[in-house]
Amino acid sequence: MKLGFITSILDGWTYEQMMDFASEQGFECVEVACWPEEKAERRYAGVSHIDAERVNQDDEYAAHIMAYAEKAGVEISALAYYPNVMTADKEKRNAAIEHLKNVIRASKKLGVGMVTTFIGRDQTKNVRENLELVKEIWPPIIKLAEVCDVKIAIENCPMLFGEEQWPGGQNLMTTPPIWREVFKILDSDNLGINYDPSHFIWQMIDYIRPLYEFKDKIFHVHYKDIKIYKD
């Protein structure tokens, strides 16, 4: 396992500045933010250190991205884009899906082979209805990932932290029972988990047991400290 960080915390930095910092601080890898150029709807979104669309269109730019990573001695562990591709807003949904596909193609072109994201959630629907929506929205995305030989790692964050994320949150894949259902629907070796145990702690879920049951599905890991104040 290699230690790195998600680059969305360095909003306003260039790709080169971010890579230089990672190298100087001794990080082995980075999960590189690849949001489209747009106004951020929430904290840590809207950050882009790699322009995925440009990667797919500009061979010289793509070569520079990889050459600079090699020069810095820092591996790109994944391309990161965490939208809600199952939002009830069809215009936003379609835009998010298209950009996610661009990120998948860019991951292939750069030789990264990993994209980290959310499964999404329609906040107007219950869990069962959202599972039906997974059947509608995700198969073409997974098919593209398979064709590109890119793994998709879904983070287990509920995305339930603000008024705009209520009710239900914006990410369906938040508990092991739902993981089982989604993996039945999307039976692919290219779909797995970006495992973040901190989200299980505040949901009062065992964060060790899933490591054994889903050991073959854990593609990437987020690790952060957390403390529950019960008062």
Residue ranges and their predicted role:
Residues 3-7, 28-32, 76-81, 115-117, ...:
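Hydrophobic faces of well-ordered beta-strands that scaffold small-molecule active sites
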Residues 9-11, 35, 81-82, 120, ...:
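Residue-level "edge-of-site" marker
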Residues 35-38, 84, 159, 200, ...:
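Active-site loop signature of alpha/beta-hydrolase-fold enzymes
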Residues 45-52, 80-88:
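Glycine-/proline-rich flexible loop or hinge segments
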Residues 16-38, 108-113:
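Catalytic domains of carbohydrate-active enzymes, especially glycoside hydrolases
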Residues 7, 18-19, 40-56, 128, ...:
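Gly/Pro-rich active-site loop or hairpin
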Residues 1-4, 69:
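N-terminal amphipathic alpha-helix/helix-capping segment at the start of soluble metabolic enzymes
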Residues 17, 62-75, 84-195, 202-205, ...:
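Active-site acidic/histidine proton-transfer and metal-coordination neighborhood
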